[in-house]
């Protein structure tokens, strides 16, 4: 796992799995974890990385409902999960799919997780829309294409766009 500061309020974290990433975003005393790394050791290290950088994670955001974007629950189990309307609908309409696909990945790569993945209580967010963080707000924009339920997050004060799977140095077959 690699972490890079993009701005004093933004840290990009890249997983060993497919070079996927997550982004920690802070405003004042609050921070969100957007997306997630994949492997258990990366998820276990994420809270310490956030704390060391002064990011108190109070919420999680999922850019879409693919299993590898929902794993921040392992790192921040007490932080509620927010997702765009279409992502929340996909989680409701495809119950257990994310967990099943995660188990298939784990079986193939001999990954052991500390507990089952829980996605209950997902907060549905309007897209396009805003979500408050500290004294500021993040902009949520529709980003269908890779999936029908994609959401991109714009961090206006840092001028950072979090695009989920749309930008990657790795081509996944």
Model-derived regions: residue spans:
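Catalytic core of the metallo-beta-lactamase
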Residues: 1-53, 57, 116-173
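Active-site HxH/HxHxD metal-binding segment of metal-dependent hydrolases
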Residues: 43-44, 48-126, 130
């Amino acid at each position: 796992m690699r972490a890079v500061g993009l701005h004093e309020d933004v840290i990009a974290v890249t997983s060993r799995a497919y070079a996927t990433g997550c982004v920690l975003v802070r405003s004042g005393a609050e921070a969100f974890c957007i997306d997630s790394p994949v492997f258990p050791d990366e998820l276990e290290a994420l809270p310490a990385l956030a704390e060391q950088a002064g990011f108190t994670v109070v919420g999680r955001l999922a850019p879409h409902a693919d299993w590898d974007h929902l794993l921040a629950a392992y790192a921040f189990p007490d932080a509620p999960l927010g997702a765009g309307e279409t992502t929340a609908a996909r989680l409701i309409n495809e119950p257990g799919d994310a967990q099943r696909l995660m188990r298939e990945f784990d079986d193939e790569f001999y990954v052991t997780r500390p507990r089952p993945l829980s996605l209950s209580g997902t907060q549905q967010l309007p897209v396009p829309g805003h979500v408050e963080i500290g004294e500021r707000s993040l902009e949520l924009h529709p980003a269908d294409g890779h999936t029908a339920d994609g959401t991109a997050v714009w961090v206006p004060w840092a001028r950072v766009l979090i695009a989920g799977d749309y930008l990657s140095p790795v081509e996944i077959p």
